[in-house]
Structures are given as C-alpha cells and as structure tokens.
C-alpha cells in the first residue's frame, strides 16, 4: 500500500504542475482576448446574446410530456423537443433555473443541459434524457450486472466528478438517484440544482442541502468544507453499489444526522468483499475531509484495485455480490434510531408517499392548465385584433371602390368642361409693335369643320399650351379658368382634350383655330384683353376680310411683349350682379370676367372725353338692353345660335415682329382702303409706352384683303365678333346693368398708375359703345387671363387698383410689399401654382359698394 501511495505521488505532482501551467496559460491569453476581438472574433456581448437566445426554451415548445417521478426539488417529465426526447425537471423557484455556469459543461459522463424555461408559472430545466433511469433503481432490480459493467460504472463516476472539480464545480448532492444510466449503459451524473461554483481554493461555509444518508459530516455540522464533500458521497455510492441496499435504511433522518455528525453511526463493510475496494470506500468515508483522496487519486487507485476484482469468475462474482446484499440487509441498528424496527414499510409510510406523489402531479396539472389558459387568452386577443383588421380592410376596400366609381362619374360629367393643363409657351424677346402672324384667314361657322391648332401657334397660349392642343387645367398658370366668374371649383384634369385632326397638313401648318362662346374656349375665357399680348385679328387681316365666307371676325388683344408669351400672370376677378329687371328673368345668365374679349372696345375710344358718371358708360361689359347692331358678316340669319361658332384661321406664313424700318407710307399707298394707325415708338420703358399710347389718336380700321396693319396701342379700336346693332334703342338706367367690371368701377385706364394728373385719369377711361349680347346671339364669357410684363409692373398695377388716397410712392411701396408676399411668377411652369390670395376691393365705398365687393380665392 505504501508503494502504491508512493507511485501515486508522482502523478499528483504532475497534475499540480499541469494545473499551474494551465492557469498561467489561461491568464496570459486572457490579456489578449480584447485585442483578438478586433481581428474577426465576435464580441463577448454578441456571443452571450446568441447563447442566451438558444438557452431560453419556451415551455410550449416541448410536447408529449409524461410524468416520471418527483423529489424534494420537483417533478420530472420527459417529452419531445426539436425531434429529440428530453427530460424536463420542473422546479419550484425561478432561482433554481439559474444554471448558466453549467451549460458549458461537456463530458460523456455529465448530463447535458439543453436550456431552461424561466417563464411563469412553469420553471423548468431541460436536459438530456436517459431511458434506463436512476442507478438505485437499476441496482435494486434483479438485472444481471457483470464485473466489467460494475468496474466501468465506478470509473465513469470518478471521471465525471473529476471533470466537475476541474471546472470548479462542487456537486454537493451526489447520490445514486442523481446518477443515471443511458441507453448505452454509461453513467450520466445529473441534478446540479444544489451544485456550488467554487471560486477559491479555501474552504467555504455551505448550506445544509442534499440527502442526509449521503451527506458529509462537515456539511451536517455546517463546518467549512470544500470539494471533499463529494468524495464522501462517492464512498457512500460505492457501498451502495457493492451491497445494492439503501444506506442507513429504516433509520430516522434526525438519527442519521446525529449519528453521522458525531461519528457514532457508520456503514459496516462485508468481510468477503475485495480488499482494495473496501480500502477505497473507507478512505472516502473518513471523518476528516483532509484524509479523503481526490478523484484523481481515486481514478489511479481504481486502476490498481481493478485486477483483484477480475480474479473471480463471473459466476463467483454473482454469488459474492448476492452475499454482499444479504450482509447489508442483516445489519442491526439500535431500536432507538430505527423507524419501524427494521421491518418492511408500514401502510402509513406507503400512503404518505402516495399522497406526496399525487400532490406533485396535481400541482403540475394546475400549472399546465394555468399556462394554457393564459395562452388561450392571448390567442383570443390576437384573433380579435386580426378580425378587426380584416373588417377595417373590407371597409377601406369598399370606400376605395366607391371613390373610384365617383371619380369615374366625375370624369364623365366634366369630360367637356374641364380643360387640361399644358406646358407654357417658350420665351422669346419682342419689342415694339408685334406681328404674330401674316396670313390669309378663313372663317367658318361650322364647328365640325374646325381646323386643328398648329403646334407652336402663338394663339394657343391662353387656353391651350403652345406645345400641345389639349386644354389647360383649371387654375393653372396658363389656364383662363383661374379667375373666371363662372368657374366656382377646381375640376379634374381627366377631361377629354379638344379634337385634334390627324391630318399632318393641318397639324404642322401655321393655321390655328378658336372657338367663340364654347365652355373653356379662348374667346370666352382667354386673356384676350388690352394687355394679354395676343395679336388682334379684328384690326388686321380678320377685319380686312370682313366676314368672308360668312365667318364672324374674332377679336384678339395686343400689347407690348417684354419677355415672350411664356410669361403668365394671375387672372382678374370680376363681380357679378343679379338682374333687377323682371323683364330679363327669362334671359339666360351672362357671365363676365375682366380682360375678356367683351370688355375690349369695338369702336373708336375717345381718350379726351371726360369720365362719365353713369355706370352704364363706365362698365366694360355692355348692358343687356344696350343698342345692338348685327354685322353684315354674321351667318346666323338673326336666329338664336344653339351653340358656339368656331372660327378657323389658316395662316400662310409665320408671324414676325416688325422693325422700325417698316415703310408705312408705301404700304398705305399700295392699299388705299386700309387706314393705318400710328406706330408706337420704340421705348424701353413700360410707363413711357403707355403715356405715348394715350397721346395717340384713334383711327378706325377698315377691311382690306390679306394685308396686316401695323399694331396699335393696347387701347384701340376692336371689332366685336358678336356685335349686333339695333336702332332706336334707348339707354337704360345703370341699375339694369347685369354685370359691371370689378376693375373699371374703381380705376381708370391701364396707365393710371403712372399718370401724375387727375385730368389724365379722367381722360383715360375705357367706354364700350357696343354690346356683346343681343336677343339673337348671346355668348358666355367665363374666364380671363392677364399677362403682365414683370413682377414690379404687376405690383404697381395692383397698387393703383387698390388706391386709398395715398401718394404715388406710398402706393408703389405697398404694391411691391404685397407682391413679394403673395405673387409668384414663373416663365414656364406646366403645374398649377396655387396662390395664397387674390383680393380686390372697391375704391369708392359710396359709389361702387353695391357693384364690387371683396372677392377672395
């Protein structure tokens, strides 16, 4: 024995040095772990997070749970998890599931932990399942256990405990019920619920835990202890394997605690047992912990004592083993410490065990029911939310279908009413008098034979874009419907465009077309005004033709263009009055807007005449009862026109801008029938141009054949396309006027913002001597659009319109300030720009309060 002990000392020293080197190596490499993490290694936090996600197992993920047994720490079940049979140990408290320090343990003789369930009410530990059960159960059965199997089990238990101690884990509850047999008949040490992680080599105070029959004396006495408590428990397990009996059977628990603690009670050894095995058991059951060998020594000793076991044959082993069991049963303990005097279990003890088992089962069933009720509640709540989502989705689908149906209906209703939005015309520079077109013009009253507009025609810039023949969108920059008195709301852009002929000769020629009186036509709602910048056909070749082919001469406005036809401005707002006369109630309503063709004077305007005090003479739109005269060129035969007449004008050449070198005298000599107006002198100032226009004399134009006149001032003679004259018609009172100009009632001519004398303002009034409406022919002019020269000039005009008695400089400053806040101008913008507000106020509260109020858009 001494030699064996001496030989065992060398491995002990080797293990000591090996452990020292291992600690040194671990300490050195631990310093470089943070640095190595920067070179491809995962951070520690990410590793822990990934492990935590796999460590937590939901209890409902485990299926087919079956009860296996119960103990002091809880019941044990087996079930299926991820196509694997697992053991589920149900514990009573959450802290018992805190075994993260054990999940890294990987040994063939240590049970593998798969995860924990830390969700209330089922606190469980999921581990590897061993189908053959506990070691104590296998030993008590009459199964055949060979010598090799017995020797292997002893060695495997020692190997497993040695692995735990190397990892600083103290089991503290090593016993045969916590040693399982796998399907391969290998040992699996389990039940680490009472294990302790040893952080120091010194002995520590441990709590009273474990089963008293396998408990070390120092633990019973609550003395400082270390890993040697597991060695004592291992000695008790060896005695149990040798005798196949429960240690200290039929002895009360308190008697075991007292007897083991005071060294009065011990386990007797069979006399016929192998000497080496008996010596190992006695060393492990030493009263002092320092006298017990470590598991590394136990492994070495067993390798020495094992040949003695194999000296016997298998039959001799089985006979000797049975005799060891009979010896254990014959052990007599004092009657004062036994429970039932060494007899079999009483009926009361069996009933008590049955009640405990039933109580554990009922508690488990209660917890499972509570868990599934909570899950059912969550499922019902999710179902209600999902049902609400489906209901909301159906409502939204119904609303969407209704909205699409209404949208289709609106598009069908406004298919002929809503013009499309088109891009603005390109910008080009013009100075002086402009000749947008020189051509022979054909006029026709047949709508079906309309000539499509030419792509790039300058006459498409008011209600239609210069780049396409479709109508513009309402309230867009170039749309004439923005400030129409008859247009109340915005309309969809889904309306159909005007028909464009597919004839290439018509599409790409210089011809153009206009529609008089149609909804959305240029004659009704375009910027054909004294400042719109569009060529006036009434004073040029249209007037010259004088009703050729039965056409009605169309009226266009003219002005001095500064930055081309692409610059658009805001429209004007016109006010409307109800017809007070009862005689006019049956007549169709007439809409009037500023800058419409009806406001353009068609006769000679006398700038020197004083401003009339009568509203009838001051209004731009003529009275319904005003004298009318039907022109000779009208093809309506004095009949009521059911719909608008169209005028198609075919152009032979493109328009050109006149030069100051044009010879007016030579042209007048060649065409004596044409009376020419004085040409506007070239100037770089808009104010000077307006003043020069006011100083020129008006010349009435006569029709000629195919020669364009020189352009006149913005205020000149115009031909009304719907002009009807009646004789001996008396002038009505101002109260019979249907519509009055919201601008003429509160301002003078266009250049009154720059006139320094009040006398010039009185002489610059625009008076219409003709009417745009008769009983035979009535047209509705809905929209208008005014193109200003620049933002500053536009602002000055607004300031003059809102004259409140201030000086000219104050009015200009106020206009500029208002323009900066409210006016936005772009040269070419196809999108509709919504302005903040357009306001017009009456300049005279006493005179025009009934006719012109504040209009806001």
Curated annotation (Swiss-Prot):
Key words, A-Z: ATP-binding, Kinase, Magnesium, Metal-binding, Nucleotide-binding, Serine/threonine-protein kinase, Synapse, Transferase, Ubl conjugation
Keyword check for Disulfide bond: no
EC primary class: transferase
SMART domains named in the record: S_TKc
Polar residues composition-biased segments: 609-623, 763-772
Biased composition (Low complexity): 467-488
Subcellular location: Synapse
GO BP: any one term: signal transduction
All residue ranges annotated as the Protein kinase domain in the record: 62-304
SUPFAM superfamilies in the cross-refs: Protein kinase-like (PK-like)
Residues reported to bind ATP: 68-76, 89
Record PTM: Ubiquitinated by rpm-1. Negatively regulated by ubiquitination by fsn-1 bound rpm-1, followed by degradation.
Pfam families according to UniProt: Pkinase
UniProt GO molecular function: ATP binding; MAP kinase kinase kinase activity; metal ion binding; protein kinase activity; protein serine kinase activity
E.C. designation(s): 2.7.11.25
Cofactor(s) this protein requires: Mg(2+)
InterPro entries in the cross-refs: Kinase-like_dom_sf (IPR011009), Prot_kinase_dom (IPR000719), Ser-Thr/Tyr_kinase_cat_dom (IPR001245), Ser/Thr_kinase_AS (IPR008271), Ser/Thr_Kinases-Pseudokinases (IPR051681)
Active-site feature positions: 173
Family per similarity comment: Belongs to the protein kinase superfamily. STE Ser/Thr protein kinase family. MAP kinase kinase kinase subfamily.
Role according to the record: Component of a MAP kinase pathway that functions presynaptically to regulate synaptic architecture and presynaptic differentiation. Phosphorylates and activates mkk-4.
The name this protein goes by in its record: Mitogen-activated protein kinase kinase kinase dlk-1
Gene coding for it: dlk-1
């Amino acid at each position: 024995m001494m030699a064996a002990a001496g030989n065992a000392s060398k491995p002990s020293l080797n293990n000591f040095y090996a452990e020292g080197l291992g600690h040194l190596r671990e300490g050195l490499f631990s310093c470089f772990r943070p640095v190595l993490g920067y070179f491809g290694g995962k951070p520690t936090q990410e590793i822990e997070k990934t492990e935590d996600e796999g460590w937590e197992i939901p209890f409902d993920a485990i299926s087919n749970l079956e009860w296996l047994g119960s103990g002091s720490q809880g019941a044990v079940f087996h079930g299926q998890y991820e196509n694997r049979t697992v053991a589920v140990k149900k514990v009573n408290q959450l802290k018992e599931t805190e075994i993260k320090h054990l999940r890294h343990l990987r040994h063939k003789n240590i049970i593998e932990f798969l995860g924990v369930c830390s969700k209330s009410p089922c606190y469980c530990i999921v581990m590897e399942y061993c189908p053959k059960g506990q070691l104590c159960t296998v030993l008590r059965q009459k199964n055949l256990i060979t010598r090799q199997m017995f020797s292997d089990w002893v060695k495997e238990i020692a190997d497993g405990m040695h692995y735990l101690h190397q990892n600083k884990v103290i089991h503290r509850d090593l016993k045969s019920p916590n040693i399982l047999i796998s399907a391969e008949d290998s040992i699996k040490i389990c039940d680490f619920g009472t294990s302790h992680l040893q952080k120091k080599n010194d002995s520590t105070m441990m709590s009273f835990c474990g089963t008293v029959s396998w408990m070390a004396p120092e633990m019973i006495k609550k003395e400082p202890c270390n890993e040697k408590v597991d060695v004592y428990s291992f000695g008790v397990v060896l005695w149990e394997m040798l005798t196949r009996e429960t240690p200290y059977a039929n002895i009360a628990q308190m008697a075991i605690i007292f007897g083991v603690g005071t060294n009065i009670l011990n386990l007797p050894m069979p006399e016929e047992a192998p000497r080496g095995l008996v010596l190992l058991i006695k060393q492990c059951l030493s009263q002092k912990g320092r006298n017990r060998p470590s598991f590394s020594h136990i492994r070495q000793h067993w390798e020495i004592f094992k040949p003695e076991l194999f000296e016997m044959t298998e039959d001799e082993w089985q006979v000797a083993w049975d005799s060891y069991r009979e010896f254990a049963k014959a052990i007599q303990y004092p009657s004062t410490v036994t429970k039932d005097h060494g007899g079999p279990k009483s009926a009361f003890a069996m009933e008590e065990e049955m009640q405990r088992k039933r109580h554990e089962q009922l508690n488990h069933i209660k917890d499972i029911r509570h868990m599934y009720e909570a899950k059912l509640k969550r499922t019902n709540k999710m179902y209600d939310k999902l049902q609400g989502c489906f209901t909301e989705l159906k409502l939204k689908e119904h609303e969407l279908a209704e909205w699409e149906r209404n949208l289709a209906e609106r598009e069908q209703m406004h298919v002929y009413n809503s013009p499309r939005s088109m891009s603005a015309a390109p910008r080009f520079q013009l100075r002086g008098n402009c000749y947008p077109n020189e051509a022979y013009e054909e006029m026709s009253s047949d709508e079906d034979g309309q000539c499509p507009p030419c792509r790039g025609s300058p006459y498409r810039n008011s209600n239609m874009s210069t780049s396409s023949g479709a109508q513009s969108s309402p309230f867009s920059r170039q749309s004439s419907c923005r400030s129409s008195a008859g247009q109340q709301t915005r309309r969809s852009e889904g309306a159909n465009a005007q028909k464009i002929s597919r004839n290439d000769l018509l599409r790409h020629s210089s011809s153009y077309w206009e529609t008089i009186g149609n909804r959305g036509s240029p004659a009704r709602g375009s910027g054909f005004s004294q400042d719109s910048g569009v060529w006036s056909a009434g004073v040029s070749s249209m007037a010259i033709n004088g009703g050729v082919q039965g056409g009605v001469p169309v009226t266009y406005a003219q002005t001095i263009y500064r930055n081309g036809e692409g610059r658009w401005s805001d429209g004007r707002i016109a006010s409307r009055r109800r017809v007070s006369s009862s005689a006019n109630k049956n007549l169709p309503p007439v809409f009037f807007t500023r800058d419409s063709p009806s406001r353009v004077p068609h006769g000679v305007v006398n700038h020197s005449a004083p401003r009339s005090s009568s509203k009838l003479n001051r209004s731009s739109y003529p009275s319904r009862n005003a004298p009318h005269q039907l022109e000779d060129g009208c093809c309506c035969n004095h009949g009521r026109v059911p719909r608008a007449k169209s005028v198609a004008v075919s152009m032979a050449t493109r328009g050109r801008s006149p030069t100051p070198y044009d010879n007016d005298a030579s042209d007048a000599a060649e065409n004596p029938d044409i009376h020419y107006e004085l040409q506007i002198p070239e100037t770089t100032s808009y104010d000077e141009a307006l003043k020069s226009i006011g100083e020129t004399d008006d010349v009435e134009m006569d029709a000629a054949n195919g020669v364009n006149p020189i352009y006149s001032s913005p205020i000149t003679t115009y031909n009304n396309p719907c002009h009807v004259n009646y004789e001996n018609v008396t002038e009505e009172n101002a109260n019979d006027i249907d519509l009055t100009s919201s601008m003429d009632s509160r301002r003078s001519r266009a250049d009154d913002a720059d006139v320094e004398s009040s006398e010039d303002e009185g002489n610059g009034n625009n008076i219409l001597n003709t009417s745009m409406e008769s009983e035979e022919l009535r047209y509705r002019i809905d929209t208008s659009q005014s193109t200003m020269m620049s933002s500053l000039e536009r602002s000055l005009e607004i300031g003059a319109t809102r004259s409140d008695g201030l000086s000219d400089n104050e009015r200009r400053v106020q206009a500029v300030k208002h323009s900066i806040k409210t006016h936005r101008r772009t040269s070419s913008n196809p999108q509709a720009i919504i302005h903040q507000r357009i306001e017009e106020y009456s300049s005279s509260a006493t005179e025009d309060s009934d006719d012109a109020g504040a209009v806001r858009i």
